[in-house]
Amino acid sequence: MYDIFRCVVHKAKTGCQWEHLFVDLECVKYPFSWQTVYYYHSKWIKAGVYEKAFFAILIEYQLLLDTEKLNLDGTHTLVKKAAESAKYQHRKKGRTSNVLVLTDGRGYPIGIGDIISGNHNDLYDIIGLFSKIMNQIKKCGIFVENSYLNADKGFDCKKLRRAIHRRKMFPNIKENPRNRKGNKRGKKRFFDEKVYKKRFVNERSFAWIDSFRTKTVRNIFNYRNKNTFLKDLLRNGLQFL
């Protein structure tokens, strides 16, 4: 089983086709076949093995996580062929899917939202997605009270700030002027520039994930399979970054 898992990781990293899996992979020999690897990979996805492994690693290493500063951001994946939750995104010049990822202070992924179409902005169904991410963290027993949650100005809204406050965290979100010419009335919102700069560890994590070429372009129709496979990649990132 370990060799099969190594083959799956190799496929994800190189982006090769399944039938070409063993062209440059010498760690396994006959009677292995790419059909065997694909069979177990599909079986593990349907059984939720990757997702369970992701949560198991978070539970095992939760004391090593830097939960004092959390970071929320989204990442887009280009979509080829027909696929669920895929729409045109003008910045990427193509059809994309988007997923929200919550990382700790070092950039390790600790929570992942559902995949949504790429034509939506960052605030689309933000409360539902954020609640699901926080439920994942709670399930793993990760303590996040009194933490700073960094997010860019695309996430600046009252609903999200209230949701963060309800969980006894501090929303460190850059204010979005939204075409205002003057200063906003009322009490000035909390914002720590030094803590906010730490959120760029997300870019390192997303760059590492993008090094997995299978993830760079989505060819899988069912969004649940893709989400599970993404969790597998993030699980590896949590272990080896």
Regions found by a protein language model. Name each.
Residues M1-L241:
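Short alpha-helical elements
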